[in-house]
Amino acid sequence: MGILNKIFGTYSERELRRVNPIVNKIEALDEKMQSLKDEDFKLKTEEFKSRLEKGEKLDDILPEAFALVREAAHRTIGLKHYREQLIGGVVLHQGRIGEMKTGEGKTLVATLPAYVNALTGKGVHIVTVNDYLAKRDRDLMAPVYEFLGLKVGVILHNLNNEERQEAYGSDITYGTNSEFGFDYLRDNMVVYKEERVQRKLNFSIVDEVDSILIDEARTPLIISGQGEKSTEFYKVADYFTKSLIAEKDFTIDEKANSAMLTDEGVNKAENFFKVDNYADAENMEIQHHVVQALKANYVMKKDKDYMIKDGEILIVDEFTGRAMEGRRYSDGLHQAIEAKEGVRVERESKTLATITYQNYFRMYNKLSGMTGTAQTEENEFREIYGLDVIVIPTHEPIARIDNADVVYKSEKGKFKAIVDEIVERYKKGQPMLVGTVSIEKSEMLSSMLKKKGVPHQVLNAKYHEKEAEIISHAGEYGMVTIATNMAGRGTDIKLTKEAEEAGGLMIIGTERHESRRIDNQLRGRSGRQGDPGESRFFVSLEDDLMRIFGSERIQGIVDKLGLAEDEAIESKMVSSAIESAQKKVEGNNFDIRKTLLQYDDVINKQREIIYKQRSEVLEGEDLKDQIRDMIRDVVYTAVNSHISGVEEEFETELQNLVNYLEDICLPKALVKVKDISNLSDEEIKEKLLEAVENIYSRKEKEIGEEQIREIERVILLRVVDTKWMDHIDDMDHLKQGIGLRAYRQQDPVQAYQFEGSEMFEEMIYNIKVDTVRYLFHVEVEKAPEREKVAKETSTNYDEDSVKKQPIKKENRIGRNDMCPCGSGKKYKNCCGRMA
């Protein structure tokens, strides 16, 4: 590949040759745009819209539209897109990922494709990683769009429904990945179409695309309500797990981040929980709690994976180092950690709706993204999202010097060398950003520097409120900043003149991350827009990456050389061995994400079917035919499943059939067994269907055509939602136990697909049965007022949590009132359970 690239250029270079002629056309229009009056800009926007309506394509108007945005930006915010930014804009418009280094002006680049694609009137979403950046970018760029006659909105998590509808109705909408995803889920839980906020998903530009589409890919967005399970079992499992002996009773697999009981551990579990066979399916609950307790006690590390704040367990994001308030581990792991640390164990929640970022973003008609580091994950972007990565050239050549890694035998020797390096450079006044992998390591390094008398600032999850302030000082003369991986993405480190003269920002990596991309992000904090700078990583053979994934060859070389603790080796062979260890981990993580996607695709297809049907019910005025079909299906299926064809059983089967239908849709004693015992199966179906349809027709007349249609809609939506929530739970339980199928020589993914699809079909049938049952029992005295439904929500795993929305109701029914559906039960024990 290397030789071919030298002859033909890299893929990015070849693609850029195709983009250059378009950029030449844009630049050639510069003079024409400068001659326009201010009021002409809005008129040009109207002209473009009219040309599109007449059949021109976006690509036809692109050069002129880009040139117009370029001039508008110059007049409103004093910034003019330079050539490389125009290239970036074209790449994004083409639905690709543009790799643009830190400080290259990604926020400004997004205005180009956003404007062009907004001309279709279908909306553009610009996605950032947090509320602060969404609002900042909207405020910075709004003058450009408004000068061109477009409306700009921003979605923040404290907005109400009307404000969200207005923001989504804008031509261009800024917001965070979690807000866009949660709004999609909530839109598919409403009972009235007027409550939906989003339009169809058209075009999305994702900033920090690697962070959202890869690091967060395994993170499901979850809207949940309070679960019913007790939390006591977590404490029992924790007590049992703490009594176990490592290696003897359980083993830890650091590569897979998991722990498993040995045969001896299984014996102990059987004695402790008083069960005969621990592996039995009926003991799945015990297995689940023990697995999570093992992981909590022996795999998850305090101040690395999570921290305790005010008696609450907060997850620490492994990629950014930020504490993620409002986010909880799923599958009971969070409760297991709470039991381990002796804080209050919260109840497990019940999932009401869920989707992964992978599947949410794949729903857009066109998707594009920007980041400083994407090339290392190019295969994943292409395979999962169908996106290719184009490296955009920098405006100024990169002047940063990237030194080779230095490798030490022990962690102690490595940290001593790091402190010596910091002291040396501090004397020269060179600013330094020191990247650590955990809160614990950043605090250890901080105390070592204090002993040496080196003043410094610390940025980790414990001090994240001061993040913007700390980063704003990081480029000053003599400033030493210790940061976990968070390192303030989205905020540039600007150098003072004295700092520039002292050599620019020095990046010191105290450990290699599992992902080369995270290392590149740290490096990329230095050398922005041609600034001077330097970087170096310090590695020890005791680091997690080297210990778990490193090759024995390096250990062999170090042993042969007989290195002392504070001696280092620096060689290409060592650097390439580190890189191959990282590639191994990246490949491993990619495979995990791919497998998870295969599982998620099963429920995703089911979600699409349910949400599509739900949307049709919301939009449709008349469900009469659909309800009649349901009634027929319920009656026919009941006959088929009750009558076996065995003559001796016939009378009993008919009695069971009549009893079954009386529970759903037949009044008592309307149909007697003797009336149908001489009929064929087909005649029985017709006779029963006729009886049931006549009853429903009478009900229609009693209640009134308009009212019954509204009741059908509300009941069907309620039943669909209830059954879908239960189905999500069932699929979750199926997935938890499916891994064991490998022991039976079964492919777990195929087993999950097969059984999941059977469960889905069963759910669809149960939706029909319950809908018919509720409709036949409903009795209404007067026209029902419309109910506004907002579900109880809690967040997934994002730092900006979704707050609970109050349930607003009109004409509220008391919990102990009789249910209006006519079942004779109290409201709380009947339809109230679904509300």
Swiss-Prot record:
Location(s) in or outside the cell: Cell membrane; Cytoplasm
Catalytic reaction(s) noted: ATP + H2O + cellular proteinSide 1 = ADP + phosphate + cellular proteinSide 2
Assigned protein family: Belongs to the SecA family.
Enzyme class at the top of the EC tree: translocase
Gene Ontology MF terms: ATP binding; metal ion binding; protein-exporting ATPase activity
Matching Pfam families: P-loop_SecA, SEC-C, SecA_DEAD, SecA_PP_bind, SecA_SW
Residues the entry annotates as binding ATP: Q85, G103, E104, G105, K106, T107, D492
Keyword Zinc-finger: no
GO biological process: intracellular protein transmembrane transport; protein import; protein targeting; protein transport by the Sec complex
GO cellular component terms attached to this protein's record: cell envelope Sec protein transport complex; cytosol; plasma membrane
Cofactor(s) this protein cannot do without: Zn(2+)
EC annotation from Swiss-Prot or TrEMBL: 7.4.2.8
Protein name: Protein translocase subunit SecA
Gene: secA
Entry keyword set: ATP-binding, Cell membrane, Cytoplasm, Membrane, Metal-binding, Nucleotide-binding, Protein transport, Translocase, Translocation, Transport, Zinc
InterPro entries reported in the protein's UniProt record: Helicase_ATP-bd (IPR014001), Helicase_C-like (IPR001650), P-loop_NTPase (IPR027417), SEC_C_motif (IPR004027), SecA (IPR000185), SecA_CS (IPR020937), SecA_DEAD (IPR011115), SecA_motor_DEAD (IPR014018)
Function: Part of the Sec protein translocase complex. Interacts with the SecYEG preprotein conducting channel. Has a central role in coupling the hydrolysis of ATP to the transfer of proteins into and across the cell membrane, serving as an ATP-driven molecular motor driving the stepwise translocation of polypeptide chains across the membrane.
UniProt membrane topology term: Peripheral membrane protein
Residues binding Zn(2+), per UniProt: C819, C821, C830, C831
PROSITE patterns: SECA, SECA_MOTOR_DEAD
Quaternary structure (record): Monomer and homodimer. Part of the essential Sec protein translocation apparatus which comprises SecA, SecYEG and auxiliary proteins SecDF. Other proteins may also be involved.
